[in-house]
Amino acid sequence: DSAAGAVRAGDDETLLKPVLNSLDNLVSGL
């Protein structure tokens, strides 16, 4: 279970990073 949780956490991070980068770009564009 802990291994699966770690993988899920890693997936969440990789999915969130591009989103956060996009938000940063939008804020800089303002």
Curated annotation (Swiss-Prot):
Q: Does the keyword Lyase apply?
A: no
Modification Leucine amide, positions: 30
Provide this UniProt record's keywords sorted from A to Z.
Amidation, Amphibian defense peptide, Secreted
Gene Ontology biological process terms from the UniProt entry: defense response
| Secreted keyword on record | yes
Q: Where does it live in the cell? A: Secreted
Main localization (coarse): secreted
Q: In which tissues is it expressed?
A: Expressed by the skin dorsal glands.
Q: Name one GO cellular component term.
A: extracellular region
Similarity comment: family membership: Belongs to the frog skin active peptide (FSAP) family. Rothein subfamily.
Q: What is this protein called?
A: Rothein 3.2
